[in-house]
Regions:
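Repetitive, compositionally biased segments used for assembly/scaffolding
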Residues: 93-214
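Long terminal segments
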Residues: 1-94, 176-285
Protein backbone atom coordinates (compact mmCIF):
# COMPACT_ATOMS: atom_id res chain seq x y z
CA UNK A 1 0.00 0.00 0.00
CA UNK A 2 1.17 3.51 -0.81
CA UNK A 3 0.31 6.42 1.49
CA UNK A 4 0.54 10.02 0.33
CA UNK A 5 0.97 12.66 3.02
CA UNK A 6 0.30 16.05 1.40
CA UNK A 7 1.11 19.55 2.63
CA UNK A 8 -2.14 21.29 1.74
CA UNK A 9 -2.06 23.76 4.61
CA UNK A 10 -2.93 27.41 5.01
CA UNK A 11 0.45 29.01 5.63
CA UNK A 12 1.91 27.22 8.68
CA UNK A 13 -1.21 26.03 10.49
CA UNK A 14 -3.16 22.78 10.72
CA UNK A 15 -5.97 23.93 8.43
CA UNK A 16 -6.71 23.59 4.73
CA UNK A 17 -6.11 26.45 2.30
CA UNK A 18 -9.76 26.86 1.27
CA UNK A 19 -10.69 30.51 0.81
CA UNK A 20 -13.55 32.79 -0.16
CA UNK A 21 -14.45 32.55 -3.84
CA UNK A 22 -13.62 36.21 -4.53
CA UNK A 23 -10.11 36.04 -3.05
CA UNK A 24 -7.31 35.82 -5.57
CA UNK A 25 -5.03 32.83 -5.14
CA UNK A 26 -1.43 33.96 -4.89
CA UNK A 27 -0.21 30.39 -5.41
CA UNK A 28 -1.54 27.49 -7.45
CA UNK A 29 -3.19 24.62 -5.56
CA UNK A 30 -1.30 22.17 -7.77
CA UNK A 31 1.79 20.50 -6.34
CA UNK A 32 3.82 17.32 -6.71
CA UNK A 33 1.51 15.27 -4.48
CA UNK A 34 -1.49 15.95 -6.71
CA UNK A 35 0.56 14.85 -9.72
CA UNK A 36 1.70 11.67 -7.98
CA UNK A 37 -1.81 10.75 -6.85
CA UNK A 38 -3.34 11.26 -10.30
CA UNK A 39 -0.61 9.08 -11.82
CA UNK A 40 -1.13 6.24 -9.34
CA UNK A 41 -4.91 6.56 -9.62
CA UNK A 42 -4.66 5.52 -13.27
CA UNK A 43 -2.81 2.36 -12.25
CA UNK A 44 -5.57 0.14 -10.85
CA UNK A 45 -2.98 -2.33 -9.54
CA UNK A 46 -1.42 0.20 -7.17
CA UNK A 47 -3.42 0.58 -3.96
CA UNK A 48 -2.97 3.94 -2.30
CA UNK A 49 -4.48 6.27 0.27
CA UNK A 50 -4.20 9.96 1.07
CA UNK A 51 -3.30 10.79 4.68
CA UNK A 52 -4.69 14.17 5.77
CA UNK A 53 -3.10 15.50 8.94
CA UNK A 54 -4.71 18.95 8.93
CA UNK A 55 -8.26 20.09 9.54
CA UNK A 56 -9.85 19.86 6.07
CA UNK A 57 -13.61 20.54 6.15
CA UNK A 58 -13.76 21.15 2.40
CA UNK A 59 -11.50 18.36 1.19
CA UNK A 60 -14.20 16.84 -1.05
CA UNK A 61 -14.48 20.09 -3.01
CA UNK A 62 -10.70 20.42 -3.21
CA UNK A 63 -10.24 16.85 -4.44
CA UNK A 64 -12.99 17.34 -7.03
CA UNK A 65 -11.24 20.44 -8.40
CA UNK A 66 -8.01 18.48 -8.69
CA UNK A 67 -9.55 15.38 -10.32
CA UNK A 68 -9.01 13.23 -7.21
CA UNK A 69 -12.57 12.96 -5.92
CA UNK A 70 -12.61 9.15 -5.91
CA UNK A 71 -9.24 8.87 -4.19
CA UNK A 72 -9.42 7.04 -0.83
CA UNK A 73 -8.24 9.01 2.18
CA UNK A 74 -7.83 8.97 5.94
CA UNK A 75 -8.34 12.18 7.90
CA UNK A 76 -6.73 12.67 11.29
CA UNK A 77 -9.35 15.23 12.34
CA UNK A 78 -12.18 12.94 11.21
CA UNK A 79 -10.70 10.24 13.44
CA UNK A 80 -10.41 12.70 16.33
CA UNK A 81 -14.00 13.95 15.98
CA UNK A 82 -15.26 10.45 15.09
CA UNK A 83 -16.96 11.72 11.94
CA UNK A 84 -18.59 8.95 9.92
CA UNK A 85 -19.98 10.86 6.93
CA UNK A 86 -18.02 10.56 3.71
CA UNK A 87 -20.21 12.08 1.00
CA UNK A 88 -20.76 15.73 0.21
CA UNK A 89 -24.12 17.21 1.16
CA UNK A 90 -25.80 20.33 -0.20
CA UNK A 91 -26.03 22.92 2.57
CA UNK A 92 -27.81 26.24 2.13
CA UNK A 93 -27.63 29.15 4.54
CA UNK A 94 -31.44 28.92 4.54
CA UNK A 95 -31.08 25.57 6.33
CA UNK A 96 -29.53 27.31 9.33
CA UNK A 97 -31.74 28.40 12.22
CA UNK A 98 -31.99 32.20 12.15
CA UNK A 99 -33.89 34.49 14.54
CA UNK A 100 -37.37 35.38 13.38
CA UNK A 101 -37.29 38.65 11.49
CA UNK A 102 -33.70 38.39 10.24
CA UNK A 103 -33.10 40.19 6.94
CA UNK A 104 -30.55 39.11 4.32
CA UNK A 105 -28.60 41.68 2.32
CA UNK A 106 -26.90 40.35 -0.80
CA UNK A 107 -23.60 41.88 -1.87
CA UNK A 108 -21.48 40.83 -4.88
CA UNK A 109 -19.21 38.92 -2.49
CA UNK A 110 -21.07 37.64 0.56
CA UNK A 111 -24.42 37.70 2.36
CA UNK A 112 -24.98 39.85 5.44
CA UNK A 113 -27.75 39.02 7.91
CA UNK A 114 -29.32 41.97 9.72
CA UNK A 115 -31.35 41.65 12.90
CA UNK A 116 -33.13 44.65 14.39
CA UNK A 117 -31.14 46.79 12.00
CA UNK A 118 -27.77 45.55 13.28
CA UNK A 119 -25.24 43.27 11.62
CA UNK A 120 -25.93 39.79 12.97
CA UNK A 121 -23.93 37.51 10.67
CA UNK A 122 -21.90 37.35 7.46
CA UNK A 123 -21.95 34.29 5.21
CA UNK A 124 -18.84 33.53 3.14
CA UNK A 125 -18.77 31.08 0.24
CA UNK A 126 -16.04 28.88 -1.22
CA UNK A 127 -14.89 28.57 -4.81
CA UNK A 128 -17.63 26.04 -5.55
CA UNK A 129 -20.43 28.19 -4.12
CA UNK A 130 -20.78 26.30 -0.84
CA UNK A 131 -20.92 28.16 2.49
CA UNK A 132 -17.58 27.75 4.25
CA UNK A 133 -17.67 30.34 7.04
CA UNK A 134 -20.36 32.21 8.94
CA UNK A 135 -19.20 35.01 11.23
CA UNK A 136 -21.58 36.03 14.03
CA UNK A 137 -21.63 39.54 15.54
CA UNK A 138 -22.71 41.22 18.75
CA UNK A 139 -22.76 45.01 19.06
CA UNK A 140 -20.67 45.36 15.93
CA UNK A 141 -17.91 42.95 17.02
CA UNK A 142 -17.32 39.41 15.88
CA UNK A 143 -18.23 36.93 18.63
CA UNK A 144 -18.16 33.58 16.82
CA UNK A 145 -16.90 32.04 13.58
CA UNK A 146 -18.40 28.76 12.36
CA UNK A 147 -16.59 26.57 9.83
CA UNK A 148 -18.91 24.47 7.68
CA UNK A 149 -17.93 21.04 6.42
CA UNK A 150 -18.85 20.19 2.83
CA UNK A 151 -20.60 17.10 4.19
CA UNK A 152 -23.31 19.31 5.64
CA UNK A 153 -22.52 20.26 9.24
CA UNK A 154 -20.54 22.68 11.43
CA UNK A 155 -17.20 21.05 12.22
CA UNK A 156 -15.43 23.84 14.11
CA UNK A 157 -16.22 27.10 15.84
CA UNK A 158 -14.06 29.95 17.12
CA UNK A 159 -15.22 31.98 20.11
CA UNK A 160 -14.18 35.63 20.40
CA UNK A 161 -14.18 37.89 23.42
CA UNK A 162 -14.06 41.65 22.87
CA UNK A 163 -13.17 40.95 19.26
CA UNK A 164 -10.18 38.75 20.19
CA UNK A 165 -10.01 35.01 19.60
CA UNK A 166 -10.40 33.13 22.88
CA UNK A 167 -10.52 29.47 21.84
CA UNK A 168 -11.40 27.14 18.96
CA UNK A 169 -13.55 24.05 19.29
CA UNK A 170 -13.36 21.09 16.92
CA UNK A 171 -16.79 19.48 16.82
CA UNK A 172 -18.36 16.10 16.32
CA UNK A 173 -21.24 15.70 13.86
CA UNK A 174 -23.73 16.37 16.67
CA UNK A 175 -22.02 19.79 17.30
CA UNK A 176 -20.61 18.68 20.67
CA UNK A 177 -17.00 19.78 21.05
CA UNK A 178 -14.24 17.16 21.04
CA UNK A 179 -11.12 19.34 21.24
CA UNK A 180 -10.73 22.87 22.58
CA UNK A 181 -7.63 24.84 21.60
CA UNK A 182 -6.71 27.81 23.77
CA UNK A 183 -5.76 30.81 21.61
CA UNK A 184 -3.36 32.29 24.18
CA UNK A 185 -0.90 29.38 24.41
CA UNK A 186 -2.07 26.72 21.92
CA UNK A 187 -2.83 24.18 24.65
CA UNK A 188 -5.51 21.60 23.91
CA UNK A 189 -8.24 20.14 26.11
CA UNK A 190 -10.12 16.94 25.28
CA UNK A 191 -13.80 16.82 26.22
CA UNK A 192 -13.78 14.49 29.27
CA UNK A 193 -17.27 13.27 28.37
CA UNK A 194 -16.07 12.12 24.92
CA UNK A 195 -12.42 11.04 25.36
CA UNK A 196 -12.27 8.58 22.45
CA UNK A 197 -11.02 8.74 18.86
CA UNK A 198 -11.53 6.35 15.96
CA UNK A 199 -9.02 3.72 14.87
CA UNK A 200 -9.10 1.16 12.08
CA UNK A 201 -10.35 -1.53 14.44
CA UNK A 202 -12.69 0.56 16.60
CA UNK A 203 -11.95 3.39 18.99
CA UNK A 204 -9.34 4.27 21.57
CA UNK A 205 -9.14 6.63 24.51
CA UNK A 206 -6.80 9.61 24.38
CA UNK A 207 -3.73 9.15 26.57
CA UNK A 208 -4.41 12.50 28.27
CA UNK A 209 -7.18 15.05 28.61
CA UNK A 210 -4.85 17.99 28.11
CA UNK A 211 -1.97 18.55 25.70
CA UNK A 212 0.55 21.32 25.14
CA UNK A 213 -0.31 21.64 21.45
CA UNK A 214 -2.30 20.25 18.52
CA UNK A 215 0.95 18.69 17.31
CA UNK A 216 0.87 16.28 20.26
CA UNK A 217 -2.73 15.26 19.60
CA UNK A 218 -2.13 14.72 15.89
CA UNK A 219 1.01 12.70 16.57
CA UNK A 220 -0.81 10.40 18.99
CA UNK A 221 -3.69 9.67 16.61
CA UNK A 222 -1.33 9.36 13.63
CA UNK A 223 0.87 6.92 15.53
CA UNK A 224 -2.06 4.53 15.96
CA UNK A 225 -2.90 4.85 12.28
CA UNK A 226 0.68 4.08 11.21
CA UNK A 227 0.88 1.10 13.57
CA UNK A 228 -2.08 -0.39 11.71
CA UNK A 229 -0.26 -0.20 8.36
CA UNK A 230 2.06 -2.87 6.99
CA UNK A 231 5.82 -2.79 7.53
CA UNK A 232 6.31 -2.98 3.76
CA UNK A 233 4.01 -0.04 3.05
CA UNK A 234 5.55 3.14 1.65
CA UNK A 235 4.83 6.72 2.70
CA UNK A 236 5.30 9.53 0.18
CA UNK A 237 5.71 12.63 2.35
CA UNK A 238 5.55 16.17 0.97
CA UNK A 239 8.23 18.04 2.90
CA UNK A 240 6.72 20.87 4.97
CA UNK A 241 8.06 22.52 8.11
CA UNK A 242 4.71 22.11 9.89
CA UNK A 243 4.55 18.33 9.92
CA UNK A 244 8.12 17.06 9.59
CA UNK A 245 8.70 16.40 13.30
CA UNK A 246 5.20 15.03 13.88
CA UNK A 247 5.62 12.62 10.96
CA UNK A 248 9.31 11.88 11.16
CA UNK A 249 9.14 10.49 14.68
CA UNK A 250 6.17 8.24 13.80
CA UNK A 251 7.10 6.68 10.46
CA UNK A 252 10.75 5.79 11.13
CA UNK A 253 9.92 2.08 10.90
CA UNK A 254 8.26 2.45 7.49
CA UNK A 255 9.62 3.02 4.01
CA UNK A 256 9.56 6.76 3.37
CA UNK A 257 10.00 8.83 0.23
CA UNK A 258 10.34 12.58 0.86
CA UNK A 259 9.27 14.92 -1.92
CA UNK A 260 10.15 18.59 -2.35
CA UNK A 261 8.24 21.37 -4.06
CA UNK A 262 10.18 24.58 -4.68
CA UNK A 263 7.36 26.99 -3.82
CA UNK A 264 6.66 25.25 -0.51
CA UNK A 265 9.98 24.57 1.18
CA UNK A 266 13.05 26.79 1.49
CA UNK A 267 16.06 24.63 0.62
CA UNK A 268 18.29 26.81 2.81
CA UNK A 269 16.54 25.26 5.85
CA UNK A 270 17.19 21.67 4.80
CA UNK A 271 19.80 21.22 7.55
CA UNK A 272 16.99 21.16 10.14
CA UNK A 273 15.47 17.97 8.65
CA UNK A 274 18.62 16.10 7.65
CA UNK A 275 18.02 13.48 10.33
CA UNK A 276 14.71 12.51 8.74
CA UNK A 277 16.04 12.62 5.18
CA UNK A 278 18.90 10.25 6.01
CA UNK A 279 16.44 7.54 7.04
CA UNK A 280 14.40 7.79 3.83
CA UNK A 281 14.40 5.36 0.91
CA UNK A 282 14.42 8.10 -1.71
CA UNK A 283 14.25 11.88 -2.02
CA UNK A 284 12.40 13.48 -4.94
CA UNK A 285 13.11 17.11 -5.81
Amino acid sequence: MLYFVPAWYKENSWIENEQQWYMRRMKSEFDETIKQITLFHRNVDAKYRIVLLGYSPNFRHFSHRQGMYRSPYWSCFDAIAQIKRTKMAVLSYHDIKWPEGVEFVYSPFSIVALYNGQKYAQVEFGEDGNPIIIDMYEEGQICRRNYYDDRGFVSSTIIYENGQMKYQDYLMENTIWKLRVNASDGSVMVNPSYPMYDTKTGEKQFCKLSYDSLDEVIQEVLSDFVNETGVKDTFFVAVHSLHMKVLGDVIRERKVVYTFFEERYDYSKIHSIKGYLKSSEYIIT
